[in-house]
Amino acid sequence: MAKTSITVRHQRKKKFEVREYNRCPICGRSRGYLRRFDMCRICFRKLASGAQIPGVVKSSW
């Protein structure tokens, strides 16, 4: 979990647009972010394995 201060600081608008970056809204993680699902890889894996994200199926071949 990200520190509360970092999460709050991220919500403020940056002076320069280039400095903005994505954060997971669930845990606040900045790395491993999946744009398509708007969350980090860890939260995605947890929710996908629990069948809470519609349309996501575990692949097997």
Curated annotation (Swiss-Prot):
Binds 1 zinc ion per subunit. Keywords: Metal-binding, Ribonucleoprotein, Ribosomal protein, RNA-binding, rRNA-binding, Zinc. Its cofactor is Zn(2+). One of its GO terms (cellular component) is small ribosomal subunit. It comes from the Bacteria. GO terms for molecular function: rRNA binding; structural constituent of ribosome; zinc ion binding. Part of the 30S ribosomal subunit. Contacts proteins S3 and S10. Binds 16S rRNA, required for the assembly of 30S particles and may also be responsible for determining the conformation of the 16S rRNA at the A site. This is Small ribosomal subunit protein uS14. It comes from Leptospira interrogans serogroup Icterohaemorrhagiae serovar Lai (strain 56601). The gene is rpsZ.
